[in-house]
UniProtKB/Swiss-Prot annotation:
Domain annotation PAZ: ranges: 836-960
Organism field: Arabidopsis thaliana (Mouse-ear cress)
All copies of domain Helicase ATP-binding, residue ranges: 51-223
Site (Important for activity): 1322
Protein EC: 3.1.26.-
Name of the protein: Endoribonuclease Dicer homolog 3
Localization: Nucleus, Nucleolus
Subunit-level organization: Interacts with DRB2 and DRB5.
Lineage: Eukaryota, Viridiplantae, Streptophyta, Embryophyta, Tracheophyta
Length: 1580
């Protein structure tokens, strides 16, 4: 090998290229500052224009060197393609990294007037549907994305390449091998019938590492790139164009001597240390295996970390010297010190790595000067530093180069290094070297995807610092340097030779300033480096004629895949579509599946045309996988669903001309107050109701009284056509008169005012909702329902009267006033002088028989009942309703307001009881009011006064209907709502159709199972859902355990999870359309309408769907927290929490179990589509398999255990297997039985709690089960019953854990509360569960016998009165109920976690501290300390619940002797600093929110409100937020705020039309008062 290359060898390959330098120039230390040709530019951009013209006509790969503005070319090309007159086709710009995507997107947006958008994985595009992609394609013209995104979109057939007119590929030299660029071209471009134009951009056509041995080798790589991209390399002829317009770059080498050999003694010491600590890690790994924790991957990580650190230190030692090797060890040590591990074993591994690096530091330190082991004075001792090996010759030359920059502050230098460790240690060296203090140095390395946010921020900030001269020396790696936007520099130094031609070419692009340099470091006498540089400089890019035809296309690849040919979607073995991983997860494999192995399962999955998983078949997913929080069945996701109609309420009799036959159901009402009479009613339906629906009772809760409603069937009844008309009149008249309106239209709205029953009301009678509610004669027998036709006929006569005589227009056509007697023939002679007669609009009545008479106002259509005739009053009496109105008398009021001239103004006024809206009578709000809003002592709640109307009798028409009928009509909306709910429950029961002997399930149970907590009822699905969850888990576990005897516990758990997961239950539930039956909204009586009733409170549908049923489409899903759950539109659409759909399935399983046991619940599961079953033969087979196992008893090892559990096993091996830990390495262990026993105990305990505590609420039931069913509780059961002594094990770590647990088992906590600081080993809880599983099999699935054995073992089970919540949760709930906030602070010193909780009471700041292994345990201990302090002040969860008091009832004042000294933090801040609040948000709810955040921040208790209401017949006027509002009610609230260490502040707000607005007003007034007292400062 020659030491230099002759000139003729430099010219090999022909042609003269000024970039090819003669190697004879490299062998000397020539002056690197030789002057080059001045830089030449062309203001017209001739070169860019030439490239653009060629790219416009054909596919090219533009090799753009230094100084060429590729943005200008891209802009011209995009503008030309984007402005074409053809149909819209997309322009796609591809960049290989996310940083480049963002950078190019910003540049393109600034350059072109088109709609540009960027796409990459972090935007969640992997989950986008076809509709979402279609929206993106339609809204944007230019799409900038990574190639993998485009590849996935094409594979899913969301996009076809025919829709693209231009494909720009940046850094296109990556189009090789398995890069997404190459896959894109092979799979789609060459297959496309209408190909887009290709424009490739690169600085070098070849990227591959290694030495390019010959021009032909290089040309072959270029040819391969051209074939794949269907394009030609474009370079100007002999690069004259480039050299003409590119910046001049001066290039020169720096030669350095080889590094002297390091001390063999030192290297041997380092190697010995590495082997020693590596062996320590291996020993820890062996111990980890004994504990049977899955630690192999973690140990491999630590071993790899140890080896990497060792190699990095050796690299620095060989190439940079002793000092840098010492610095490298420091860097590695800092990194390992930042590692936090919770496991003791992992902490030991981390400690081993740390001790290794400390040992390395100590070993290297011996060879460095003792006075300063970091640095030497390079200015004075550079030669001795090199000789001693402290600094390598290469590093010395770098420092000499940097020293030449002294005094030139404008000098900016980029230094390219191969390894990150090189950049880090040299940066440290430079910063510590005093002679280089004039340099501002930083390093920038590759952006690892796992890098934290601060590191990613530095990737952006460091180049900016370099550009503005704040950093003049920047170390970078070639990975960052390629494609990264690094600012201009005056010197580019390749400290390590570039490995690829692309990297070499890119390195030249950064030296773009005038008189710039490009410097290579070369080792003297190193032929490998010289040859490598030679090949890098011989970039033999073939210059071809731009007008020549393109190279032949790449042959289409062989596709081993699965897809939909019609639309082009496909999955291939190397597909990145997630369905391949999903498919692979369904296979049981010992090793990770290969890409080819994933493909067959993909074909078995049910996929849609876009290869997304459809809902048609159950997806078997891995257990406990971290699915999206907004997936199906999650709490976060809300879904729009329709509401199923009750078929029993439908009818076709509306148009029958011959009458109709009905099924009659009588409603009887009985009040608990004697003398209160309610009329019975009859419900007439076309359908026959189920027995338990047609005969039901319910309680109706009125104010201070209870009415029992009972429904009973009364057989068939037939109505003639005439009777039907009158019956419909009655229903329309009363339901509209009392809950709606009888007069429709308004002059103010420009519509004619009409009597409702004079108009066409057929639209109010819909066949899906057709029934009649008619009064029944009061003396009727309970078993029959005789319609009260006298009342109905009276109503019909009034309807006819109003059609002719209602005062609708109030003035005649000439604008004259109307006389009430004009044209009303039915009126008696007004000259009648009988003093006891009262003249009504349609009749006269005796004055003494007016009480409870039902009347209707003929000018408003409102229905009243008469209380009395007011003596000494008449229409000429002073108008007292509104003194400020200006009306002198009632007669004047009616004359001026309505244009009515009264014919009998001297008659006494009628005192009338007004009709009101319907109320929800199904919930006992009286009881709830006592619990939630009981006023504080001394403030007795006043009963609201009754508001009566006063009208002249001649404006009233008498209706001969008892007032008891009106009273009953107020009850009917609630009765019908409950009855309709039961009809739906019965309808669902018929669909499920469980025909099992001696089985029946009530509609009430079904109704409970479909009612959520958001529906304010006295029942909900929660308890049944809790039970159903356990039943389903138990059944699924038994089914899998018996069906798959060869599967291990992990496989069984994954399959069970796939069955019982919320997402699977959601899929099955929606496939059965159960979502329409779910009741999740409050009953709104004002929106309930009877057939024929006009709704006063319509909610028009704005859901974007015309049908009642809502399809399962992502556009009807949301995560919006402001969505109102359960509030339906008039089409029945409402938002439902996705988890409620899954919970409904479990609740129905629970309901069927309660009614019919496991057989009924199994039927329910099968109806849903859950494939589970109990085959008795499988149980026998399982016992037979166990019985055949060889078992030789050893000294009665099982007899003692059988005695403890009081059961003798028929299959002894079951018990042997149940106590065998896997550490014994037998062919069996307890894991499968533990899987079964876990579900058995969960089910048995849940069933016990469900049956024992029937009145316990769902929340407390969940807490009880959690307290009973957990591994810690079972571990205590094992120790208490001495079952742990029978656990067969051979694991040192487990043995230690058990012994430690036994020692701390009886150790009391310092707070006196049972918070074990040591968690029980999982194996102890597992053995209890495995024994339960063994017992279940041995008893042939006899659950009662298993419970007989385990109930005494588990006793005493926790009871509601002894339930102890986790301390932190208990504190949180207690403070929430009392209106107090607390502040939490957590920290971790690497050994233990510390937690501090501060709670501010009225006059004392309480502090609780805790220190434990984890933050959770530390918080629990801190909360426990606080709860203990609160209990001393008689503040606890039990006392507040027991006394049934609110936060205002609890005495929070402390005796002065008990007061704790406030911390200096609290006293000083409160005494000196006045806190700021606001600015106040004046929108509705804004002031309350502002005060809430302030109280939370400063630990002030939440305020309390006391509200008074005033009602009026005439509307109040309010000015609220600059807007005028009117309301018949006025609310005024008083707020009380307890400020710590001050007197309570009380302030009243202004009157407002609603209660919440009055709260806001009170808060605003309070805040201004606080500011006046200088307690707070309100920010403007």
């Amino acid at each position: 090998m020659h030491s230099s290359l002759e000139p003729e060898k430099m010219e090999e390959g022909g042609g003269s290229n000024s970039l090819k330098r003669k190697f004879s120039e490299i062998d000397g230390d020539q002056n690197l500052d030789s002057v080059s040709s001045p830089m030449m530019t062309d203001s017209n951009g001739s070169y860019e224009l030439k490239v653009y013209e060629v790219a416009k006509n054909r596919n090219i790969i533009a090799v753009l060197g230094t100084g060429i503005d590729k943005s200008e070319i891209t802009k011209r090309l995009i503008k030309a393609m984007g402005s074409s007159d053809t149909d819209k086709r997309l322009i796609i710009f591809l960049a290989p990294t996310v940083n480049l995507v963002k950078q190019q997107c910003c540049e393109i947006r600034a350059l072109v007037n088109l709609k540009v958008e960027e796409y990459f994985g972090a935007k969640g595009v992997d989950k986008w549907t076809s509709q979402r992609w279609d929206e993106e394609f339609s809204k944007h013209d230019v799409l900038v994305m990574t190639p993998q995104i485009l590849l996935d979109v094409l594979r899913s057939a969301f996009l076809k390449l025919e829709m693209v007119c231009l494909l720009i590929i940046d850094e296109c030299h990556h189009t090789t091998g398995n890069h997404p660029y190459a896959k894109l071209m092979k799979e789609f471009y060459h297959e496309s019938t209408s190909k887009p134009k290709i424009f490739g951009l690169t600085a070098s056509a070849v990227i591959r590492k290694g030495i390019v041995s010959s021009p032909s080798n290089y040309a072959a790589q270029v040819s391969e790139l051209e074939r794949l991209m269907d394009s030609k390399i474009f370079n100007p002829e002999e690069r004259e164009g480039v050299e003409k317009f590119a910046t001049t770059v001066k290039e020169g080498p720096i030669l350095y001597n080889p590094s002297p050999s390091c001390s063999l003694e030192l290297k041997e010491k380092l190697e010995t240390s590495h082997l020693k600590f590596d062996a320590s890690l291996r020993r820890l790994q062996e111990l980890g295996k004994d504990s049977f924790l899955n630690m192999d991957n973690k140990f491999e990580t630590y071993q790899k970390r140890l080896s990497i650190d060792y190699r990095e230190i050796l690299h620095c030692l060989d190439n940079l010297g002793l000092i840098c090797a010492h610095l490298a060890a420091e860097v590695c040590l800092e990194k390992i010190s930042d590692t936090k591990e919770e496991s003791e074993t992992y902490k030991e591994c981390s400690m081993v790595c740390k001790e290794f690096l400390e040992d390395i530091l100590s070993t290297i330190g011996v060879y460095l000067p003792q006075d300063d082991k970091s640095l030497v004075d390079l200015q004075q001792n550079h030669l001795s530093a090199v000789i001693s090996g402290h600094v390598s010759p290469k590093l010395k030359e770098l420092f000499h180069l940097l020293d030449s920059f002294r005094g030139d502050k404008q000098k900016q230098c980029l230094i390219l290094v191969e390894r990150i460790i090189t950049a880090k240690v040299i940066e440290r060296f430079v910063k510590k070297e005093a002679s280089l203090a004039y340099l501002n140095v930083l390093y920038l390395t590759e952006n690892n995807p796992s890098t934290n946010v601060s590191a990613q921020k530095m990737q952006i900030e460091i180049p900016d610092l370099f550009q503005h001269g704040k950093v003049n020396l920047l170390f970078i790696t070639d990975v960052v340097e390629e494609g990264f936007q690094v600012p201009d520099c005056s010197c580019m130094v390749c400290f390590d030779l570039p490995k690829t031609m692309c990297s070499y070419s890119q390195s030249q692009k950064h030296a773009k300033q005038s008189n710039s340099k490009s410097i290579m470091f070369l080792e003297r006498g190193n032929p490998k480096q010289r040859d490598h540089l030679h090949d890098l400089m011989r970039r033999e890019v073939l210059i071809q004629d731009p007008e020549a035809p393109n190279l032949k296309s790449c042959p289409p690849p062989v596709k081993n895949g699965h897809g939909v040919k019609e639309i082009g979607s496909m999955v291939i073995p190397d597909s990145n579509i997630t369905v391949s991983e999903e498919a692979a997860s369904t296979q049981t494999m010992s090793d990770p599946p290969s890409r080819n192995e994933q493909l067959p399962p993909c074909k078995k999955l049910r996929l849609d045309n876009n290869l997304l998983q459809s809902n048609g078949k159950e997806k078997v997913a891995s257990s406990k996988s971290k699915s999206s929080s907004s997936a199906a069945g999650s709490k976060k996701r809300k879904e729009l669903h329709g509401t199923t109609c009750a078929n029993a309420l439908s009818g076709t009799w509306g148009e029958n001309i011959d009458g109709a036959t009905f099924q009659a159901y009588k409603f009887d009402f009985c009040c608990n107050i004697s003398g209160e009479v309610y009329s019975s009613f009859s419900l007439l339906l076309e359908s026959t109701l189920a027995e338990d629906v047609g005969k039901v009772e319910m309680d109706l809760y009125l104010v201070r009284k209870l009415v029992k409603a009972s429904v009973s069937p009364c057989g068939q009844i037939r109505l003639s056509q005439e009777e039907l008309v009158k019956a419909k009149y009655f229903q329309q008249f009363f339901f509209n008169g009392m809950f709606g309106k009888l007069f429709v239209g308004s002059k103010s709205q420009g519509t004619k005012r009409e009597f409702l029953l004079q108009t066409d009301t057929s639209s109010l009678w819909h066949p899906a909702f057709m029934f009649l509610l008619l009064p029944v004669e009061t003396n009727d027998l309970a078993s029959s329902a005789t319609i009260d036709w006298s009342a109905i006929n009276s109503c019909a006569s009034i309807v006819e009267f109003l059609k002719k005589n209602s005062l609708l227009d109030l003035r005649d056509s000439d604008g004259n006033q109307c006389n009430t007697s004009s044209g009303q023939e039915v009126l008696l002679d007004d000259k009648m002088e009988e003093t006891n007669l009262i003249h009504f609009a349609n009749a006269s009545s005796d004055k003494n028989s007016l009480e409870e008479l039902v009347v209707i106002a003929i000018h408003t259509g409102r229905i009243y009942s008469i209380v009395e005739a007011v003596s000494d009053s008449s229409a000429m009496s002073p108008f007292e309703v509104d003194a400020s109105s200006g009306y002198a008398t009632y007669a004047e009021y009616f004359n001026k307001k309505y244009g009515i001239v009264l014919a009998h103004p001297n008659q006494p006024l009628m005192k009338l009881k007004q009709s009101h809206h319907a109320h929800n009578l199904l919930v006992d709000f009286n009881e709830e009011m006592v619990v939630k809003t009981e006023p504080k002592a001394g403030n007795v709640r006043k009963r609201k006064p009754n508001i009566h109307a006063h009208l002249p009798p001649e404006l009233l028409a008498r209706i001969d209907v008892p007032r008891a009928v009106l009273k009953s009509i107020y009850l009917l909306p609630s009765v019908m709502h409950r009855l309709e709910s039961l009809m739906l429950a019965s309808q669902l029961r018929e669909e499920i159709d469980c025909s099992i002997d001696n089985f029946s399930i009530s509609s009430t149970s079904i109704l409970e199972a479909v009612t959520t907590l958001t529906c304010p009822e006295s029942f909900s699905m929660e308890r049944l859902e809790l039970l159903g969850d356990s039943v389903l888990k138990y059944v699924a576990s038994c089914h899998l355990f018996l069906k798959y005897p060869d599967k291990d516990e992990g496989q069984l758990s994954r399959q069970r999870q796939s069955i019982i997961s919320n997402s699977n239950l959601h899929r099955l539930t929606t496939s059965r359309k159960l979502q329409g039956y779910i009741r999740n909204g409050a009953f709104e009586p004002r929106r309930w309408t009877a057939p024929g009733q006009f709704s006063l409170f319509p909610v028009p549908c704005k859901c974007g769907i015309d049908t009642r049923e809502v399809p399962l489409d992502p556009k009807f899903f949301t995560e919006n927290m402001t969505i109102k759950i359960g509030k339906s539109c008039d089409m029945g659409h409402r938002w439902v929490v996705s988890k409620s759909v899954s919970d409904c399935a479990e609740a129905l399983i629970g309901a069927y179990y309660v009614s019919g046991g496991l057989s009924a619940s199994l039927h329910m599961m099968k109806w849903l589509g859950i494939d589970v079953d109990f085959d008795p033969n499988l149980v026998v087979e399982a016992i037979n398999r166990v019985s055949l196992r060889c078992y030789i008893p050893k000294e009665d090892e099982l007899i003692e255990l059988e005695r403890k559990i009081q059961h003798e096993f028929s299959a002894k091996f079951l018990l042997k297997e149940a106590i065998t830990h896997s550490s014994l390495r037998e062919s069996y262990s307890y894991e499968r039985l533990e899987f079964l026993g876990d579900s058995v105990l969960d089910f048995l305990i849940t069933r016990h709690l469900f049956n024992t505590y029937e009145q316990t609420g769902p929340g407390e039931m969940t807490d009880l089960r959690s307290a009973c069913v957990n591994n810690e509780n079972f571990a205590q059961v094992a120790v208490k019953n001495n079952l742990h002594t029978h656990l067969q094990r051979c694991a040192t770590v487990l043995e230690t854990q058990i012994n430690d647990y036994l020692m701390s088992f009886q150790k009391p906590d310092e707070t006196g509360r049972s918070i074990p600081s040591i968690q029980g080993p999982k194996a102890l809880g597992d053995v209890v569960e495995s024994i339960a599983g063994a017992l279940l099999i041995d008893t042939r699935l006899d659950l009662d016998q298993v419970w007989r054995v385990f109930e005494p073992l588990l006793s005493p089970l926790v009871t509601p009165d002894k339930l102890q919540l986790p301390p932190y949760r208990e504190l949180n709930e207690l403070c929430d109920s009392l209106g107090y906030f607390f502040r939490v602070k957590c920290s971790n010193d690497g050994v233990k976690a510390q937690a501090t909780i501060q709670l501010q009471l009225d006059d004392v700041l309480l502090t609780g501290d805790g220190s434990e292994q984890t933050n959770k345990l530390a918080l629990g201990k801190a909360a426990s300390h606080l709860l203990t302090q609160l209990e001393k002040r008689n503040i606890s969860r039990k006392t507040s619940l027991g006394d049934n008091q609110s936060s205002m009832d609890v005495n929070l004042a402390c005796n002065h002797s008990d007061r704790e000294t406030l911390t200096s933090e609290t006293t000083e801040i409160q005494s000196i600093v006045i806190p700021f609040i606001g600015p106040i948000n004046m929108k509705k709810g804004g002031p309350r929110g502002t005060l809430h955040e302030f109280c939370k921040k400063h630990l002030w208790p939440m305020p309390t409100f006391d509200t008074s209401e005033e009602k009026s017949r005439t509307p109040f006027e309010f000015i609220d937020g600059g807007e005028k509002r009117t309301s018949f009610s006025s609310f005024t609230s008083t707020i009380t705020l307890r400020i710590p260490n001050r007197e309570a502040v009380m302030y009243a707000g202004e009157a407002r039309p609603d209660k919440k607005s009055s709260f806001d007003s009170a808060v605003v007034e309070l805040l201004y008062e606080l500011e006046r007292r200088k307690i707070v400062i309100i920010q403007k």
